[in-house]
Amino acid sequence: MMELPLCGRGLILSLIFLLLKLSAAEIPLSVQQVPTIVKQSYVQVAFPFDEYFQIECEAKGNPEPIFSWTKDDKPFDLSDPRIIAANNSGTFKIPNEGHISHFQGKYRCFASNRLGTAVSEEIEFIVPGVPKFPKEKIEPIDVEEGDSIVLPCNPPKGLPPLHIYWMNIELEHIEQDERVYMSQRGDLYFANVEENDSRNDYCCFAAFPKLRTIVQKMPMKLTVNSSNSIKQRKPKLLLPPAQMGSLSAKTVLKGDTLLLECFAEGLPTPHIQWSKPGSELPEGRATIEVHEKTLKIENISYQDRGNYRCTANNLLGKASHDFHVTVEEPPRWKKKPQSAVYSTGSSGILLCEAEGEPQPTIKWRLNGLPIEKHPFPGDFMFPREISFTNLLPNHTGVYQCEASNIHGTILANANIDVIDVIPLIKTKNEENYATVVGYSAFLHCEYFASPKATVVWEVADETHPLEGDRYHTHENGTLEIYRTTEEDAGSYSCWVDNAMGKAVITANLDIRNATKLRVSPKNPRIPKSHVLELYCESQCDSHLKHSLKLSWSKDGEAFEMNGTEDGRIVIDGAYLTISNITAEDQGVYSCSAQTSLDSTSEKTQVTVLGVPDPPGNLHLSERQNRSVRLSWEAGDDHNSKISEYIVEFEGNREEPGKWEELTRVQGEETDVVLSLAPYVRYQFRVTAVNEVGRSHASLPSDHHETPPAAPDKNPQNIRVQASQPKEMIIKWEPLKSMEQNGPGLEYKVSWKPQGAPEEWEEEIVTNHTLRVMTPTVYAPYDVKVQAINQLGSSPDPQPVTLYSGEDYPSTAPVIQRVDVMNSTLVKVTWSSIPKETVHGLLRGYQINWWKTKSLLDGRTHPKEVNILRFSGQRNSGMVPSLDPFSEFHLTVLAYNSKGAGPESEPYIFQTPEGVPEQPSFLKVIKVDKDTATLSWGLPKKLNGNLTGYLLQYQIINDTYELGELNEINVTTPSKSSWHLSNLNSTTKYKFYLRACTSRGCGKPISEEGATLGEGSKGIRKITEGVNVTQKIHPVEVLVPGAEHIVHLMTKNWGDNDSIFQDVIETRGREYAGLYDDISTQGWFIGLMCAIALLTLILLTICFVKRNRGGKYSVKEKEDLHPDPEVQSAKDETFGEYSDSDEKPLKGSLRSLNRNMQPTESADSLVEYGEGDQSIFNEDGSFIGAYTGAKEKGSVESNGSSTATFPLRA
């Protein structure tokens, strides 16, 4: 080969590197190529417990490679029957059978085809022997006390690592210290022996962990003879041994650990010190171990070269030794030769540089043979590179670069393939890709081509290449589309073209919508101990939902999906819940979404609020008699601004330890001037307030005591209390402890008649009340109360007006007239009593009245006094709620704070007639197809002479729509029934009945009923009802031979619906004999039991359904219609009234409403009752006559009966 001048090599190198960069690509196996070793063994140890030992060598190539081996640079036969070789592979196994030590050596694998040969790195196969100590007889060792001694170990050779232990027969370790030391070779050194060192079982054990073997040296006996004269001596080095002098050399490989040892004998025991002359020991990597006997430096580097010194000292002197450390290094690659693919006629370069200490030598090989045997004209070879010009196919081969020094050899293969082929696209055609809007899309077009090819991407079915700054074609053929949009979706074509031809594939791109997140609430501020719930709302493309995964993190640290801290932090999909939140939970929380195509995250700042820390460092300054300045330092506000400070004090002599609020200060301030009261020993504390709450109080300040002074203020709330006439008990609010200003507090009370020229009467008291007797009743007095103490009195107070005690009024009002407003309301007018007879402050007037008799029947009424009071100065009032058509007595009296005075003379008046109450009941007792008979009862209160009744009726349908209202005047007051004719058949009617007097008609009572169809018989009245709780009830009042209808009803139904009915015929005595024994028949007993069970089930169902409808009060409905006569008097002012027992007045206010809603027809059971109710018990069960009955088995819950059927008489 020729050498090239240095001036031209730079340009060639640049060109060659460019060609390498463009040409270096993995060759598809379908293209012919030289072999490449893809797998190999390095060091193989034959451990005795393995079944076999495998030495690997795998390679690829086209044509398929064949394999051969060398052992210790000599051919190795793979057909040896003692090994097992794999087919089409260079790997072989050595069975662990018998002696395999002859297989130990260094192997190389060669993979060859017709284009070249690849060579593996050296593979060492180690067959370790079984380490053993030699059988020997060790003579006992006798030494004098204080002498030094070395017990040799001489461990056998074996597979590293080697661990040495000194123990006795009981396997107890020989302890090491400054005096006793085991060297790296395993020898046991004694700087000086002692009597207790004597023993006959010193044993050296050698352990080989990789071989799982421990071997023991024969025990040694050491006898230490005691000496009466032990001589001290200065140190003498045993390690390193004396024959090495004061300086020794040590070589260590870079990156390894340097271990230096030093041991000296002497008495007293020498102490070892380590140093590096002219420098410091490497910090962080140098350690001194084993009682200062060894210096250890890890990861040694070239900077660690130089001298290291160990010095042994005792009282008598010292000894030292220097170690000259040299750092060397086995070969390592600086520039490793790279495989490359070239086309015919191109140029190339192979670089190979290695580093090491000593500097490695470089050797080149071609297909495993020295390259000098295969020169090519025009090529140039240098120690570290080979340059090719005008490459031809016969340049194809495997080039090996081998770097060697005394510490090892490394070898690298570089494949040079000179190929001319049309482009081969390795990416599949019609590959589908997807990305999201805004992300980059990568469409792959991996290819192999030689010579170099150009790649052009086009939109499918278009002939021009993609252009623009959003499109970029990478060197490997991949098209990258930046910032994709929905319009980028579609098909693309990749064209690969070189001098040998062209190839094309199509790629399809789909654009998905980007995933979006929204975390709520945004940047929440939450008080400590509350619950925080974050929700991560996500929007994801429908094609990506299957791959969507949400995760939560805090300050960049991910949460576990199953929650943490015993459930305090719980993650449930999109929800993150933190219970009992603490200050440590504050931070930036992030919700992250990951799909198969994109990822995004959304953050929210969680701020945890807490009450402030207490203020600190309270300080008092500017101390004055009545003021002091208090300052403090603010505590941490825990993310919530301090709004104010509360300053409290403690100094109450009566209640020590009680803190009271003194003032409040804005949150921006940290000091305040406090106004103080005299004669108080103050101590202050401060509390901070923010929106979360109050802090704990600060530590108390120093004490500040103010001097005493006269009182500043007088008692407040001066008032009088009197239980007797002419008495005046004066009371006031006493001064608080903080208001007394000094010791010896008393009160000076002064009084005199108001407007009188007399001198003030005075009395000094210590409590807060004073009783004074005056000469007159209810006279005004000027009263003053002044505070005094030992230092003076308070400012002169302003007098207040108080009155002496009252007496009862002494005269009665005179009733001037009583005006009857209507049948229940009168107006009373009276004259006021003279002011001088009130004997106090007039509170008002009181009317007493009572009913004496009824004008309807003339019967007298027992006296029941009613009371009505009118406050203030007035001379008239209204008396409501009187009984109509009655006679009353009425009196008036005055009252003050003491009580009521004498009554006036009784005034007698009468109330006129009123309208009656509603009839007591209204029943339809019989109906036919066009007639109906109604029956009613008298009103409970007639309120006058009854003149007759007003009967009204109208048609109603199932929806309760009302027809035309018909009226009939019943002018006979004594009449209690009426027969209606000319009614429509099979029609439902609603009937209304009012009782009337000369004043008009009263409130109506209503009832519903329905006429029958053609051929039906009328409904008769229910003649008997019983309240039963048993399943069977005998009825003995039925007429023999007659038909009867039996109804079974619940007692709390208000519309008389029956839940069961049947028609029965009673039999006479002539039939009795036919059924005498029927009750004893078994089938009859079973039938009765079945009927009883069915009845019980029906009753239970009906009770449940009925109770679901709720309850209502008839009285509440009646109260909705007040009496029209009372309504007109509401404009007058009524007083407070009660009877003699202070109970409310009896009676209720009602009115007539002719436009009643249909639902008002369902009244209480009492409204359905007839005059004779003796056949019913207190429950009201089976009350009244029925207007109709439900169809058999039907039950409705709206409270009205709409269907009827006939009774069979």
Curated annotation (Swiss-Prot):
Annotated site location: Cleavage: P753, Q754, P1040, G1041
Domain Fibronectin type-III: 614-709, 714-807, 812-914, 918-1015
Extracellular side: 26-1083
Ig-like C2-type domain residues: 35-124, 128-223, 235-328, 331-417, 423-510, 515-607
Biased composition (Polar residues): 1150-1162
Subcellular location: Cell membrane
Tissue-specificity statement: Expressed in the brain, in the cerebellum and in the spinal cord. Detected in the retina and the optic nerve. Expressed in neurons and glial cells in the central nervous system and by Schwann cells in the peripheral nervous system.
GO molecular function, one term: protease binding
Keywords: Cell adhesion, Cell membrane, Developmental protein, Differentiation, Disulfide bond, Extracellular matrix, Glycoprotein, Immunoglobulin domain, Membrane, Neurogenesis, Phosphoprotein, Repeat, Secreted, Signal, Transmembrane, Transmembrane helix
Motif (DGEA): 555-558
Membrane topology classification: Single-pass type I membrane protein
Cysteine-cysteine disulfides: C57-C109, C153-C204, C262-C310, C352-C401, C445-C494, C536-C591
Basic and acidic residues bias: start-end ranges: 1115-1133
Pfam families in alphabetical order: Bravo_FIGEY, fn3, I-set, Ig_2, Ig_3
Cytoplasmic side: 1105-1209
Residues annotated as transmembrane: 1084-1104
Ranges for region Disordered: 696-717, 1115-1170
Record: glycosylation sites: N87, N225, N299, N476, N562, N580, N767, N822, N945, N1027
Domains: entry comment: The FIG[AQ]Y motif seems to be an ankyrin recruitment region. The DGEA motif seems to be a recognition site for integrin.
Quaternary data: May interact with L1CAM. May interact with ITGB1/ITGA1 heterodimer and ITGB1/ITGA2 heterodimer as well as with ANK3.
Protein name (Swiss-Prot/TrEMBL): Neural cell adhesion molecule L1-like protein
Provenance organism: Mus musculus (Mouse)
Gene that this sequence comes from: Chl1
